[in-house]
Amino acid sequence: VCYFREQSRKRTSLYSTGLRSGGGVSLQDFQKDKSPENHHYNYLTSFRKWEDAFGIDALVPRIYDRDRLDEGDIRRDFLKHALPEVDPEALAYAAQEANMSLSHDEARLFQAVNSARGKRIGRVQDHLPGVLNKLVSDLPGLDRSVEINDPRQPDMYAAFDASNRAFFKRYFGQDTNLFTAPKQVATDPEETPKYRLSDHADLMHS
């Protein structure tokens, strides 16, 4: 069972993970050279290699989108398609969510703090990503309802449209792009959030 996420959303998710791990690159500079020639993002190219190795009948491709997952839960969805003999109701699903995507405000704060710390080296920096994750998660005044805004998303969706159509035709039997198109965002990705970063200078220089 293999899950595929629309490429521009995948890039945004990787950006969020990178920030949580201490990365400080700006959103506009993050993976700005990705194109259908990139193996990691071209699902038609990469999945053909899986087909060559295991055979097409052994593959179960799925779209990674909560609205398309069984009961909106990837665990249940995986069980349904990989282990249908397992009763999903016999399992416990109480677990704390991990590595949640950052909101737009959170990402801006992470990027500012991480870039300010960028030149620090040595063991003293090893614990900082974890500390920052805790501090930002507890910080009041952040708007956590708005996802990271990347105005490049529609262009990336369009760039991969042809290869995605071919991918879905071959592996889903549908001659269309089944990925939901991202909306054009109105917010400048580098726009300062509602709070001032200077209000949290203690995070940037501590």
Listing of model-derived features with the role each one plays in the protein:
Residues 1-206:
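Anion-recognition interface
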